[in-house]
């Protein structure tokens, strides 16, 4: 093997660099069009238009409606808004997740249990895959939310999310037949998947979906929560009523614009990038096996 002459960064699952094209579109919102997007004068309307454009771009990438896109500060906030927001709107409700979720999901067990929302954690296989039937069997008549990440941030496993969604459809039908008037929502943390997997929400069968700019060559401090129309949930923050009342607080215009640009780039290059990474993964595996005999 040839010794590299410069550091090789291999932690893109933790944070990607900002793509130069993304940085370029963000720049003017720091020092030119910097007004509050809630303002009624010209600069404010320009900032609002930039947010609207980014919202439409992200909605299009998810095959969703612009009104279903909620901007947040990161995936952790999006996960918390999804889980706490739904549970707080349904007192005494139960929720289900898997043992391989991000800490921003699993760390909610104690505070949510203390608030009257018990959690069932479904184990995964030795390969890090959850069985969709195990998820379905963990659902009770008081379950209001199931949260299953799409791609894992540590080992990269992709969960059978559409299979989970199909089983939840059957459970909802059973509830309706038995006169149980309680929603059953499906949330997925797709922060690690956006650059590599088609995230059309109807195909996935989800009601809530988390995205994060810093995992797809966008800026840190930029997140999204997709919330399907009709989903009943409470906000975590109160104030000016931004994001249709879902998430109050002055919007981070440069970050939102950058996130929109990153999503657009990811959609355009997803197929080619996935093929490139697959080739690199194979090359790395072959070279390890050649350099370290007996490795498997």
Question: How should each PLM-predicted stretch be described?
Answer:
Residues 1-296:
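Pyridoxal 5′-phosphate
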């Amino acid at each position: 093997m040839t010794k590299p002459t410069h550091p090789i960064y291999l932690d893109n699952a933790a944070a990607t660099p900002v793509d130069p094209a993304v940085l370029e579109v963000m720049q003017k919102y720091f020092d030119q069009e910097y007004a509050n997007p809630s303002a009624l004068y010209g600069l404010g309307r320009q900032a609002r238009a930039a947010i609207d454009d980014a919202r439409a771009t992200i909605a299009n990438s998810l095959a969703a409606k612009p009104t279903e896109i909620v901007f947040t500060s990161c995936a952790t906030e999006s996960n918390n808004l999804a889980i706490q927001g739904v549970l707080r709107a349904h007192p005494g409700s139960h929720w289900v997740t898997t043992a391989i979720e991000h800490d921003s999901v699993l760390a909610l067990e104690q505070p949510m249990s203390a608030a009257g929302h018990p959690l069932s954690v479904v184990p995964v296989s030795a390969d890090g895959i959850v069985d969709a039937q195990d998820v379905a069997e963990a659902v009770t008549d008081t379950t209001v939310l199931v949260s299953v990440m799409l791609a894992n941030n540590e080992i990269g496993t992709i969960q059978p999310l559409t299979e989970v969604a199909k089983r939840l459809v059957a459970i909802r039908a059973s509830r309706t037949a038995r006169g149980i008037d309680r929603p059953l929502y499906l949330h997925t943390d797709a922060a690690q998947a956006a650059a590599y997997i088609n995230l059309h929400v109807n195909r996935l069968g989800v009601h809530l979906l988390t995205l994060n700019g810093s995992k797809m060559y966008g800026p840190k401090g930029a997140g999204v929560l997709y919330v399907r129309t009709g989903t009943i949930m409470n906000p975590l923050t109160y104030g000016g009523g931004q994001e249709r009342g879902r998430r109050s607080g002055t919007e981070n215009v440069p970050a939102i614009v950058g996130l929109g640009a990153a999503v657009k780039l990811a959609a355009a290059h997803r197929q080619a990038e996935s093929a490139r990474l697959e080739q690199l993964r194979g090359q790395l595996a072959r070279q390890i096996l050649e350099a370290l005999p007996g490795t498997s």
